[in-house]
């Protein structure tokens, strides 16, 4: 669980990086990134930066209730499976959500076990078909039976995009978009009902259209970031 963090003004002199990053492994599952405020990221190079970067077929993670402001491609799923992007605010980002199908050309199931793109070999080193892996992550245990190269099982639900350049960046996904679950997203809302967007106060007014989304859960923005306690000098 990675929650209630404020990450800002990072990646000012680099590219192909995220405020949060993980990648190239089917087994790094179960991470929950919740209630983080990610903003004002750098944007160098052709690839740029990502808010939360699930790179190279990373799978089985949950991105819930985060606020992205000027955070490149905010929620980035690079060919992975069974990821959840839910209840997030994406504001003035290059793209609210990114999806691609890189696994169809990059995963090498018959390569040497030491090859970083042999994702099956990485899973086999952990006996992924046996408990505790198989009981905790049953979709991982059955991955080889369900078109393992494809970006299946991803859910993009109840997200809000405001003044983003694009709602969706979907490189090479023409054949697979209908296998992604999209539901109850506000893809380009005119007025989300922020208290004061000009001052980056992204709390929602009581009359906000966002609050009418089925199942919308309040994001505790006021709790995000540093706080004073007995261990903090200043």
What is each of the regions a protein language model found here?
Residues 93, 98-234:
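Acidic, glycine- and Ser/Thr-rich low-complexity intrinsically disordered tracts
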Residues 23-25, 53-55, 73-77, 143-150:
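Short, contiguous acidic/charged loop-to-helix segments that flank catalytic cores in large enzymes
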Residues 17-18, 69-70, 137-142:
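Short Cys/His-rich Zn2+-coordinating modules
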Residues 1-12, 24-46, 51-55, 59-72, 81-95, ...:
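Right-handed parallel beta-helix
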């Amino acid at each position: 669980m990675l929650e209630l963090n404020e990450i800002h003004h990072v990646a000012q002199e680099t590219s192909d990086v995220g405020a949060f990053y993980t990648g190239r492994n089917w087994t790094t599952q179960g991470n929950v990134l919740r209630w983080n405020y990610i903003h004002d990221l750098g944007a160098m190079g052709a690839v740029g930066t990502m808010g939360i970067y699930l790179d190279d077929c990373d799978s089985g993670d949950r991105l819930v209730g985060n606020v992205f402001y000027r955070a490149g491609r905010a929620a980035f799923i690079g060919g992975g499976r069974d990821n959840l992007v839910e209840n997030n605010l994406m504001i003035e980002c290059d793209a609210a959500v990114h999806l691609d199908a890189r696994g169809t050309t990059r995963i090498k199931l018959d390569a040497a076990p030491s090859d970083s793109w042999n994702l099956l070999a990485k899973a086999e080193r952990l006996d992924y078909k046996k408990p505790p892996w198989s009981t905790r992550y049953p979709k991982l245990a059955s991955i080889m039976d369900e078109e393992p190269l494809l970006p299946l099982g991803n859910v993009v639900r109840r997200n809000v995009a405001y003044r983003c350049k694009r709602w969706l960046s979907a490189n090479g996904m023409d054949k697979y978009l209908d296998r992604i679950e999209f539901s109850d997203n506000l893809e380009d809302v005119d007025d989300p009902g922020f208290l004061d967007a000009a001052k980056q106060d992204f709390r929602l007014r009581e009359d906000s259209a966002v609050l009418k989304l089925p199942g919308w859960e309040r994001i505790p923005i006021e709790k995000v970031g540093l706080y004073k306690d007995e261990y903090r000098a200043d």
